[in-house]
Curated annotation (Swiss-Prot):
UniProt binding sites for S-adenosyl-L-methionine: Q164, R167, G208, E229, D295, F296, C312, Y324
Subcellular location(s) of the protein: Cytoplasm, Cytosol; Nucleus
Name this protein carries in UniProt: Carnosine N-methyltransferase
Reactions performed catalytically: carnosine + S-adenosyl-L-methionine = anserine + S-adenosyl-L-homocysteine + H(+)
Keywords associated with the record: Cytoplasm, Methyltransferase, Nucleus, S-adenosyl-L-methionine, Transferase
Binding site for carnosine: D316, H347, Y398
Gene Ontology cellular-component annotations: cytosol; nucleus
Outcome when changing Y398 to A/F: Impairs N-methyltransferase activity
Broad enzyme group: transferase
Length: 409
C-alpha cells in the first residue's frame, strides 16, 4: 500500500450511524477512512503540475495494490489446491506397500480440499463487501477482471490473516487476547478511571490495529477510540467482522489446514474455529469508534491530539523505530500516556533494499527517555504468543516488554 496522509480525526462524535450502539445490525457501521493526501503549496504552476502528476501516480499505484490484494483473496483456493495436489502426487509415488500402510491419507487430503473450498467462500464474501468500504475513497472497478496467480508473499500474508481471526475474534484466541490486550486495557482503566474521567472525551489511538479487537474492546468501555491499520489484508477482514458480522459464531474458518508439519493428529489440521465470539455491533449507544487506513506516521501529524496511544506488537513493524517514537511524542497531549506491549521481531530485518534499524530494548528505552517521556510502568517478561496454534507440536513464545510512559505536562 502506498503511504497516505489524512488529518487526525476530530474529537467530536462520529456522524450518526458511524459509531457502535444498540439497535438493528444493519444500522450500525464502523467508519473506515482512507488516508488523504494534503494539498501542496502552490509554489509555481510547474511545481503544482509536478505535484499533481506525483499524486496521480501514487493514486494509480495504490489502486493497483488494492486490486492486487483482492486478487490474492480470490486466488487462495487455486493456490491451496495446487499445494494439496502436490502432496497427493508425492504420496502416490511411494511404493504400493507403503501406501497401504496409510489407508486414510488420501481421505484426509479430500477433507482438506473441502476446508479449502469453505475458506475460499468466506474470503470471497469478505472481498465482495470491501469495494466501497471507505467512506472517503473509491478504487474504481477491476480493469482486468480475471483471477491471476498471486505471489508467494501475498499468499503467506493471506494465510497469516486467517490466523488473525483466531487471535482477535474466536473463543480459541481468548487466552492470547488476555495475555496481550488485557494488560493494556488495565493500564487504560487505571489511568483514566470513569470516576474521574468522562471516557467519551478520552481519545485513544491504536496503531497497527489488525482485525480491530483491541480497539473494539477499548470502545466497549466507552472511550473514544480509533484504530489505524496499513495492510489491506487486515482492513478487508476487519471491515467484514466489524460491519457485517452480528450473529455470534455464525462463520467458521479452517486456519490450520496450511500447516502440514507438527500435527499430533490428522484431525488437528482440519479443525475449525468460529467467529465472531462476540457481537461486534454490541458497542454502547453513542460510541465513538472508527478505523483509518494508511501509514501511521503520515496520517497522524497534528500535535497534542491524543490522550493515550496503545501499541501492541507494533513498534517492531517500523523501518526506524525512532520515527515511531517521534510521531508518538508529537501527537500525544501533554500529560498523555503511551502504553506498549510486544517483542522486537523487526519486520524488515534482512530484507534487501529495505531500511531496517534494529534497536535493543535498552536502546529504545534510552531514546524514549531522551525525548522526555517519564516511565511509570515497566515489565520486561510478559509471556505471550501470537496467532498460536494451540494444538501444534511447535509453538513460539515471546517475552514481551510492557511499559507505560507519560509525556510531561
Amino acid at each position: 500500500m502506498q503511504r497516505r496522509r489524512r488529518p487526525p480525526p476530530p474529537t467530536s462524535r462520529l456522524p450518526e450511524g458511524c459509531g457502535g450502539g444498540g439497535g438493528g445490525s444493519e444500522e450500525v457501521e464502523v467508519q473506515f477512512s482512507a488516508g488523504r493526501w494534503g494539498s501542496a503549496a502552490a509554489v509555481s504552476a510547474a511545481a503544482a503540475a509536478a505535484t499533481r502528476s506525483t499524486e496521480e501516480e501514487e493514486e494509480r499505484l495504490e489502486r493497483e495494490h488494492f486490486w492486487k490484494i483482492i486478487n490474492a483473496f480470490r486466488y487462495y483456493g487455486t493456490s491451496m489446491h495446487e499445494r494439496v495436489n502436490r502432496t497427493e502426487r508425492q504420496f502416490r509415488s511411494l511404493p504400493a506397500n507403503q501406501q497401504k500402510l496409510l489407508p486414510q491419507f488420501l481421505l484426509h487430503l479430500d477433507k482438506i480440499r473441502k476446508c479449502i473450498d469453505h475458506n475460499q467462500e468466506i474470503l470471497l464474501t469478505i472481498v465482495n463487501d470491501c469495494i466501497h468500504m471507505f467512506e472517503n475513497k473509491e478504487y474504481g472497478e477491476d480493469g482486468n477482471g480475471k483471477i491471476m496467480p498471486a505471489s508467494t508473499f501475498d499468499m503467506d500474508k493471506l494465510k497469516s490473516t486467517l490466523k488473525q481471526f483466531v487471535r482477535d475474534w474466536s473463543e480459541t484466541g481468548k487466552a492470547e487476547r488476555d495475555a496481550c490486550y488485557q494488560p493494556i486495557i488495565k493500564e487504560i482503566l487505571k489511568n483514566f478511571p470513569k470516576e474521574r474521567w468522562d471516557p467519551s472525551k478520552v481519545n485513544i489511538l491504536v496503531p497497527g490495529a489488525g482485525l480491530g479487537r483491541l480497539a473494539w474492546e477499548i470502545a466497549m468501555l466507552g472511550y473514544a477510540c480509533q484504530g489505524n491499520e496499513w495492510s489491506f489484508f487486515m482492513l478487508f477482514s476487519s471491515n467484514f467482522v466489524l460491519n457485517r458480522c452480528s450473529e455470534i459464531n455464525k462463520y467458521k474458518l479452517y486456519p490450520w489446514i496450511h500447516q502440514f508439519s507438527n500435527n499430533r493428529r490428522s484431525a488437528d489440521q482440519i479443525r475449525p474455529i468460529f467467529f465472531p465470539d462476540v457481537d461486534p455491533h454490541s458497542l454502547p449507544p453513542g460510541s465513538n469508534f472508527s478505523m483509518t487506513a494508511g501509514d501511521f506516521q503520515e496520517i497522524y501529524s497534528e500535535c497534542n491530539t491524543w490522550d493515550c496511544i496503545a501499541t501492541c506488537f507494533f513498534i517492531d513493524t517500523a523501518h526506524n523505530v525512532i520515527d515511531y517514537i517521534d510521531t508518538i511524542w508529537k501527537i500525544l497531549k501533554p500529560g498523555g500516556i503511551w502504553i506498549n506491549l510486544g517483542p522486537l521481531l523487526y519486520h524488515f530485518e534482512n530484507l534487501a533494499n529495505e531500511l531496517s534499524i534494529e534497536l535493543s530494548y535498552e536502546d529504545i528505552k534510552n531514546v524514549v527517555l531522551q525525548y522526555g517521556f517519564k516511565v511509570e510502568v515497566e515489565k520486561e517478561s510478559v509471556l505471550s504468543t501470537y496467532t498460536v496454534n494451540d494444538l501444534s507440536m511447535m509453538k513460539y513464545y515471546y517475552e514481551c516488554v510492557l511499559f507505560v510512559v507519560r509525556k510531561p505536562q
